[in-house]
């Protein structure tokens, strides 16, 4: 038997440790999750929207195990770790006789942890401009923001998330080595002084501070992938350009593989702050009644596509198809 010198044996041991560490840092299986927004649950008018939302949720439940589009390489869609719901959960966030009914519809359909609603996977929601003002301004029995705070505590207790902002609203968690940040309405600390638009309803409540502190504490210079989500994107007239730039500067040092939002439609685009070189890949996730995005993150690739109804108005015999197919290579190196 060959005898290795002591130094060589030590070097060999160090190599084994290094390879084990590298292997542990890489995801063993692709990460799958779904994204939707703007469910706008109704209480009195347009209540058929609630039924269309439920059809979409039922599609989420049955889609795992079906095939990815050939354009994105095929293969089977994995079981999602959860569903991201990016604001405008209900349509009337502070309206007598409607807010509580609409919230009940949302809770009954989406549930919380995948066992208590129609949806069979955990949901991670944020609020949008339709979801009502901060709780101290609310006139109804139910406040969406109060409910999000309550649900965040349950998520913490059940280890579905790992960190929550001091005000109880913004939160973050890890799936595999990917870090997720829920910034709710939009990632700023307060409404820009130039806007003056329905301030209580459009107060982001220190979301950007949470994003900054959370990424510094949990991601640092590791280079691991980051996904940031909010209701509004870089096309919203009351989250203004200078605030977009401040957000860009805050996340520039990190490996942000996508920014997810709702509010204004559906699509995939690239955006960067003026004067910058690197683009963010931005996904506008559409309305729940129409469809949802399927996202997969593997060791070196992000791929996503929109699973959408061919005719969103139908309540039976619904046909589904793929749109907005996108993929890119990703790394696990810090952005700068």
Positions of predicted regions on the chain:
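Histidine-centered catalytic micro-motifs
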Residues: 229-233, 257-267
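Active-site glycine-centered loops adjacent to acidic/histidine catalytic or metal-binding residues
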Residues: 38, 87-88, 128-129, 231, ...
């Amino acid at each position: 038997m060959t005898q290795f010198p002591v130094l060589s044996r030590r070097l060999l041991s160090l190599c084994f440790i290094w390879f084990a560490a590298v292997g542990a840092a890489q995801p063993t299986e692709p990460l799958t999750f779904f994204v939707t927004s703007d469910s706008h649950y109704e209480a009195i008018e347009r209540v058929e929207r609630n039924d269309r939302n439920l059809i979409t949720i039922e599609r989420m439940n049955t889609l795992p195990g079906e095939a990815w589009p050939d354009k994105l390489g095929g293969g089977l869609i994995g079981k999602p770790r959860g569903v991201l719901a990016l604001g405008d959960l209900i349509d009337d966030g502070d309206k007598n006789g409607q807010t509580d009914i609409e919230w009940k519809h949302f809770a009954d359909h989406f549930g919380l942890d995948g066992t208590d609603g129609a949806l069979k996977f955990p949901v991670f929601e944020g609020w949008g401009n339709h979801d009502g003002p901060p709780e101290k301004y609310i006139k109804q029995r139910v406040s969406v923001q109060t409910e999000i705070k309550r649900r965040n505590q349950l998520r913490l207790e059940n280890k579905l998330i790992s960190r929550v902002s001091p005000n109880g609203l913004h939160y973050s968690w890890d799936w595999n080595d990917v870090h997720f940040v829920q910034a709710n309405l939009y990632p700023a600390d307060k409404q820009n002084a130039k806007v003056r638009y329905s301030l209580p309803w459009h107060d982001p409540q220190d979301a950007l501070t949470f994003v900054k502190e959370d990424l510094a504490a949990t991601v640092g210079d590791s280079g691991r992938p980051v996904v940031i989500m909010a209701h509004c994107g870089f096309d919203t007239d009351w989250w203004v350009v200078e605030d977009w730039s401040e957000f860009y500067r805050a996340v520039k040092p990190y490996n942000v593989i996508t920014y997810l939002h709702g509010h204004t439609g559906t699509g995939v685009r690239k955006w960067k702050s003026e004067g910058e070189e690197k683009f963010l890949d931005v996904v506008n996730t559409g309305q729940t009644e129409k469809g949802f995005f399927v996202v997969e993150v593997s060791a070196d690739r992000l791929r996503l596509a929109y699973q959408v109804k061919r005719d969103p108005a139908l309540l039976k015999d619904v046909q589904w198809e793929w749109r907005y197919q996108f993929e890119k290579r990703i790394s696990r190196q810090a952005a700068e």
